[in-house]
From Swiss-Prot:
The reaction(s) this protein catalyses: 2-C-methyl-D-erythritol 4-phosphate + CTP + H(+) = 4-CDP-2-C-methyl-D-erythritol + diphosphate
GO molecular function: 2-C-methyl-D-erythritol 4-phosphate cytidylyltransferase activity
EC number: 2.7.7.60
UniProt GO BP: isopentenyl diphosphate biosynthetic process, methylerythritol 4-phosphate pathway
Protein's name according to its UniProt entry: 2-C-methyl-D-erythritol 4-phosphate cytidylyltransferase, chloroplastic
Function recorded in the entry: Enzyme of the plastid non-mevalonate pathway for isoprenoid biosynthesis that catalyzes the formation of 4-diphosphocytidyl-2-C-methyl-D-erythritol from CTP and 2-C-methyl-D-erythritol 4-phosphate (MEP). Is essential for chloroplast development.
Site (Positions MEP for the nucleophilic attack): 224, 280
Classification via Gene3D superfamilies: Spore Coat Polysaccharide Biosynthesis Protein SpsA, Chain A
Phylogenetic classification of the source organism: Eukaryota, Viridiplantae, Streptophyta, Embryophyta, Tracheophyta
């Protein structure tokens, strides 16, 4: 399973609260400290993360302050569903395999369609699989659009970005192979993206991570207290993503996730602490785990 890690650093406590609201793209000084991702490492940003080690979920706890409210019908979702899923060893891409009677990709589509903040969903998929999405969710109040997948992930995101409404305040990119993302976590990361311009769901790393040299000898053991595993959704202002794509294309860069595109602009990316249950279904074992987690809900 692809692992995206982020270093986080410690910073001095935040200053005393101010009576004036913060500007949209700057960390708010009147919130408790929260970790902020900046160019591959994390400074400190506002909202405290508290870990619940006794359960599968590592939830973010707010100290009475949250991100700004997200307007109704102001978010465009780009649902990436064009992968081949070769590691699953199935006859079809993994995102279309059944999970409790429903194709994996439709679980997250259903979650997004039920959120009042979402105005549309752009599904990036092979045209042969469009019929899986069309008419799949009852009483859908928002349009479902389609875009063609690209050779690489960043190409698929770019194609999806071209189809979103021009008035959208946020674009929310999600892997359809993550069927267990909760509406609560989606709302949290949307709120944080409104405040900071870009935000991503992530969870603190549990395993010990070692850095190795080219000969596979250990160089050092990294402090797991400073490491995060990235998830999706990854949310940002459309203008940031477009500007990032221009830079990526100009410099011939390759990126492994969506917020990396924004990082190339030297723009801070906020980490919203998510849930360990938001797994990516990549292997047969992942599918079994997803079934068990869904049955426990």
């Amino acid at each position: 399973m692809e692992l995206r890690l982020c270093l986080r650093l410690h910073a001095p406590p935040a200053s005393a609260p101010t009576t004036h609201p913060p500007p949209p793209l700057s960390p708010s000084p009147n919130l408790a400290l929260r970790r902020l991702r900046t160019g591959g490492s994390c400074a400190v940003a506002p909202r405290r993360h508290a870990r619940k080690w006794g359960s599968a979920v590592c939830a973010a706890k707010a100290d009475g302050a949250q991100g700004e409210a997200v307007k109704e019908r102001s978010v465009s979702v780009v649902l990436l569903s064009g992968g081949q899923g070769k590691r699953m060893g199935a006859s079809m891409p993994k995102q279309y395999l059944p999970l409790l009677g429903l194709p994996i990709a439709l679980h997250s589509l259903k979650t997004f369609c039920q959120l009042k903040e979402v105005k549309e969903v752009v599904v990036v998929c092979d045209p042969d699989y469009k019929d899986i999405f069309e008419g799949s969710i009852e009483n859908v109040q928002i349009p479902i659009k389609f875009a063609l997948p690209g050779k690489e992930r960043q190409d698929s995101v770019y194609n999806g970005l071209q189809e979103i409404d021009g008035d959208s305040e946020l674009v929310c990119v999600h892997d359809s192979a993550r069927p267990l993302v909760s509406s609560e976590d989606v709302k949290k990361v949307l709120e944080d993206a409104i405040v900071h311009g870009a935000a991503v769901l992530g969870v603190p790393v549990k395993a010990t991570i070692k850095e190795a040299d080219s000969n596979s000898f250990v160089v050092k053991t990294l402090d797991r207290k400073t490491l995060w595993e990235m998830q999706t959704p990854q949310v940002m202002r459309p203008s940031l993503l477009r500007d990032g794509f221009e830079l990526v294309k100009r410099d011939g860069l390759e990126v492994t996730d969506d917020v990396s595109i924004v990082e190339y602009l030297k723009h801070s990316v906020y980490i919203t602490e998510g849930s360990y249950t938001n797994i990516k279904v990549t292997t047969p074992d992942d599918l079994l785990l997803a079934e068990r987690l869904m049955n426990e809900k």
